Protein backbone atom coordinates (compact mmCIF):
# COMPACT_ATOMS: atom_id res chain seq x y z
CA UNK A 1 0.00 0.00 0.00
CA UNK A 2 1.31 3.45 -0.81
CA UNK A 3 2.41 5.69 2.02
CA UNK A 4 0.29 8.51 0.64
CA UNK A 5 -2.91 6.46 0.93
CA UNK A 6 -2.05 5.47 4.48
CA UNK A 7 -1.39 9.10 5.46
CA UNK A 8 -4.69 10.25 3.94
CA UNK A 9 -6.54 7.47 5.72
CA UNK A 10 -4.89 8.34 9.04
CA UNK A 11 -5.98 11.98 8.66
CA UNK A 12 -9.51 10.93 7.72
CA UNK A 13 -9.73 8.58 10.73
CA UNK A 14 -8.46 11.39 12.97
CA UNK A 15 -11.25 13.70 11.76
CA UNK A 16 -13.96 11.05 12.06
CA UNK A 17 -12.91 9.85 15.52
CA UNK A 18 -12.71 13.47 16.72
CA UNK A 19 -16.24 14.05 15.46
CA UNK A 20 -17.52 10.87 17.13
CA UNK A 21 -15.92 11.88 20.43
CA UNK A 22 -17.43 15.37 20.28
CA UNK A 23 -20.93 14.49 19.10
CA UNK A 24 -21.70 10.86 19.90
CA UNK A 25 -19.88 9.77 23.07
CA UNK A 26 -22.04 10.80 26.02
CA UNK A 27 -19.90 9.36 28.83
CA UNK A 28 -19.24 12.15 31.36
CA UNK A 29 -15.95 10.54 32.41
CA UNK A 30 -14.59 11.32 28.95
CA UNK A 31 -13.56 14.93 29.49
CA UNK A 32 -12.18 17.38 26.99
CA UNK A 33 -10.34 15.06 24.60
CA UNK A 34 -8.45 16.07 21.46
CA UNK A 35 -7.26 13.50 18.93
CA UNK A 36 -3.70 14.53 18.07
CA UNK A 37 -2.82 11.76 15.62
CA UNK A 38 -3.68 8.29 14.37
CA UNK A 39 -1.06 5.67 13.56
CA UNK A 40 -2.26 2.81 11.36
CA UNK A 41 -0.50 -0.52 11.04
CA UNK A 42 0.67 -1.59 7.59
CA UNK A 43 -2.31 -3.92 7.10
CA UNK A 44 -4.78 -1.23 8.30
CA UNK A 45 -6.18 -3.57 10.97
CA UNK A 46 -4.85 -1.71 14.02
CA UNK A 47 -4.98 1.98 14.85
CA UNK A 48 -3.24 3.74 17.71
CA UNK A 49 -5.22 6.87 18.44
CA UNK A 50 -3.16 9.44 20.31
CA UNK A 51 -5.19 11.82 22.45
CA UNK A 52 -4.49 14.89 24.51
CA UNK A 53 -6.71 15.30 27.56
CA UNK A 54 -7.23 18.59 29.35
CA UNK A 55 -7.07 18.45 33.13
CA UNK A 56 -5.21 16.93 36.03
CA UNK A 57 -3.48 13.53 35.86
CA UNK A 58 -6.33 11.84 37.76
CA UNK A 59 -8.95 13.26 35.36
CA UNK A 60 -6.81 12.24 32.40
CA UNK A 61 -6.70 8.64 33.64
CA UNK A 62 -10.50 8.65 34.11
CA UNK A 63 -10.96 9.98 30.59
CA UNK A 64 -8.63 7.35 29.17
CA UNK A 65 -10.60 4.60 30.96
CA UNK A 66 -13.84 6.09 29.59
CA UNK A 67 -12.37 6.04 26.08
CA UNK A 68 -11.36 2.40 26.51
CA UNK A 69 -14.91 1.53 27.57
CA UNK A 70 -16.33 3.37 24.55
CA UNK A 71 -13.91 1.78 22.06
CA UNK A 72 -16.49 -0.70 20.72
CA UNK A 73 -19.06 2.03 20.16
CA UNK A 74 -16.48 4.30 18.52
CA UNK A 75 -15.33 1.48 16.26
CA UNK A 76 -18.91 0.67 15.19
CA UNK A 77 -19.58 4.35 14.42
CA UNK A 78 -16.32 4.49 12.51
CA UNK A 79 -17.44 1.49 10.46
CA UNK A 80 -20.62 3.35 9.47
CA UNK A 81 -18.68 6.39 8.27
CA UNK A 82 -15.67 4.97 6.45
CA UNK A 83 -15.59 2.32 3.73
CA UNK A 84 -12.90 -0.19 4.58
CA UNK A 85 -12.83 -3.95 4.26
CA UNK A 86 -11.86 -4.19 7.94
CA UNK A 87 -12.52 -1.48 10.50
CA UNK A 88 -9.28 -1.17 12.47
CA UNK A 89 -9.02 -2.22 16.10
CA UNK A 90 -8.61 0.97 18.11
CA UNK A 91 -6.22 1.51 20.99
CA UNK A 92 -6.18 4.89 22.73
CA UNK A 93 -2.82 6.22 23.89
CA UNK A 94 -2.13 9.36 25.89
CA UNK A 95 -0.07 11.82 23.82
CA UNK A 96 2.55 13.31 26.10
CA UNK A 97 4.21 15.40 23.39
CA UNK A 98 2.20 18.52 24.30
CA UNK A 99 3.19 18.29 27.97
CA UNK A 100 6.78 17.63 26.95
CA UNK A 101 6.72 20.70 24.69
CA UNK A 102 5.30 22.85 27.49
CA UNK A 103 8.05 21.66 29.81
CA UNK A 104 10.72 22.56 27.24
CA UNK A 105 9.14 26.01 26.73
CA UNK A 106 9.21 26.64 30.49
CA UNK A 107 12.88 25.66 30.64
CA UNK A 108 13.70 27.95 27.72
CA UNK A 109 11.85 30.85 29.33
CA UNK A 110 13.76 30.28 32.57
CA UNK A 111 17.02 30.32 30.64
CA UNK A 112 16.04 33.55 28.88
CA UNK A 113 15.07 35.17 32.17
CA UNK A 114 18.44 34.18 33.60
CA UNK A 115 20.24 35.74 30.61
CA UNK A 116 18.20 38.95 30.93
CA UNK A 117 19.13 39.23 34.61
CA UNK A 118 22.81 38.71 33.80
CA UNK A 119 22.64 41.38 31.06
CA UNK A 120 21.04 43.85 33.48
CA UNK A 121 23.73 43.15 36.09
CA UNK A 122 26.48 43.66 33.48
CA UNK A 123 24.97 47.00 32.45
CA UNK A 124 24.77 48.14 36.07
CA UNK A 125 28.39 47.13 36.76
CA UNK A 126 29.72 48.76 33.57
CA UNK A 127 27.81 52.05 33.84
CA UNK A 128 29.92 54.71 32.01
CA UNK A 129 28.54 57.50 34.24
CA UNK A 130 30.64 56.29 37.20
CA UNK A 131 34.01 57.37 35.74
Curated annotation (Swiss-Prot):
GO terms for MF: ribosomal small subunit binding
Region (Disordered): 110-131
Role summary: One of several proteins that assist in the late maturation steps of the functional core of the 30S ribosomal subunit. Associates with free 30S ribosomal subunits (but not with 30S subunits that are part of 70S ribosomes or polysomes). Required for efficient processing of 16S rRNA. May interact with the 5'-terminal helix region of 16S rRNA.
GO CC, alphabetical: cytosol
Record's subunit section: Monomer. Binds 30S ribosomal subunits, but not 50S ribosomal subunits or 70S ribosomes.
GO biological process, alphabetically ordered: maturation of SSU-rRNA
Alphabetic keyword roster: Cytoplasm, Ribosome biogenesis
Gene expressing this chain: rbfA
SUPFAM superfamilies: Ribosome-binding factor A, RbfA
Organism: Natranaerobius thermophilus (strain ATCC BAA-1301 / DSM 18059 / JW/NM-WN-LF)
Identification of the protein by name: Ribosome-binding factor A
UniProt cross-references to Pfam families, sorted A to Z: RBFA (PF02033)
Similarity comment: family membership: Belongs to the RbfA family.
Location, primary (coarse class): cytoplasm
Biased composition (Acidic residues): 115-131
Localization annotation: Cytoplasm
Amino acid sequence: MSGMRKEKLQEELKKIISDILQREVKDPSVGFVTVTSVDLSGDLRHAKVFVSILGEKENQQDSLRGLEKATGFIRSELGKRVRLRHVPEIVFKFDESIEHGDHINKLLKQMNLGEDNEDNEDKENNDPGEE
